[in-house]
Swiss-Prot record:
Name of the protein in its database record: Sugar fermentation stimulation protein homolog
One MF annotation (Gene Ontology) recorded for this entry: DNA binding
Family recorded in the similarity comment: Belongs to the SfsA family.
Pfam families assigned to the protein according to its UniProt record, in alphabetical order: SfsA, SfsA_N
CDD domains given in the database record: SfsA-like_bacterial
């Protein structure tokens, strides 16, 4: 999918209060940008990193700039957690994610579980398929790791996906790696061992674990290929 244009390049000064980041643009202007990512952004929120911001045309937004990309270890990384659902939908429709082809309808944010909303609900003659997407930005030694902070929400989603399988439905946990230097995907056991245990339990109980890597450029983010999952 195409990124909003133009994007404004700058240098990260600091990220704070989870959703805010101060950035010095290349013209010397310092702006406070919205950060659409609730994780720790380990390795991606270091002062001095080069970043790309979009800018909303809305006159009512307190922070019109939004942080879209960061350059980490020489690689552009997509940090916007609103993109994975859109990327997954696009890749399902164009056949990139072949494991999820053949469904007649895709709906988003459908209520399920205990007060949750599934990212994507696929339906067709083969039944229902519940798809939970996760944005991955952390890479160590060529392996993409999730989560980058303890994720009670992620743990809850795995339990709910297992329940969907018990009810006779198909359930998929889909990791979207928004950087090109990840060659495989693994749970970040050192960061959230409970999540790692639940991910393995989910896989053993019928939840399908998929990982796809995105090609990230200054103008576009698109899923390009599946990655092996190391459990």
């Amino acid at each position: 999918m195409k990124l909003p244009q133009p994007l404004f390049q700058g240098t990260l000064i600091r990220r704070y209060q989870r959703f805010l980041a101060d950035v010095e643009l290349d013209d010397g202007t310092v702006v406070t940008a919205h950060t659409p990512n609730t994780g720790s952004m380990m390795g991606c929120a270091c002062p001095g990193n080069r970043v790309l911001l979009s800018k909303s045309a809305s006159l009512t937004r307190k922070y019109p700039h939004s942080w879209e990309l960061v350059q980490a270890d020489g690689t552009w990384v997509g940090i916007n957690t609103q993109l994975p659902n859109l990327l997954a939908r696009e890749a399902i429709l164009d056949g990139t994610i072949s494991e999820l082809s053949g469904y007649q309808q895709i709906r988003g944010e459908v209520p399920y579980g205990s007060g949750s909303r599934i990212d994507l609900l696929l339906s067709g003659e083969q039944g229902l398929c519940y798809v939970e997407t996760k944005n991955v930005t952390l890479v160590e030694d060529g392996v993409a790791l999730f989560p980058d902070a303890v994720s009670a929400r992620g743990q809850k989603h795995l339990r709910e996906l297992m329940e969907m399988v018990r009810q006779g439905h198909r359930a998929v946990n889909l990791f979207i790696v928004q950087r090109a230097d990840g060659a495989a995907l693994a749970p970040a056991d050192a960061i959230d061992p409970v999540y790692g245990r639940l991910l393995r339990e989910a896989a053993q109980n019928g939840v399908e674990i998929l990982a796809y890597r995105a090609e990230v450029t200054r103008t576009e983010v698109r899923l390009e290929r599946a990655l092996p999952v190391l459990l």
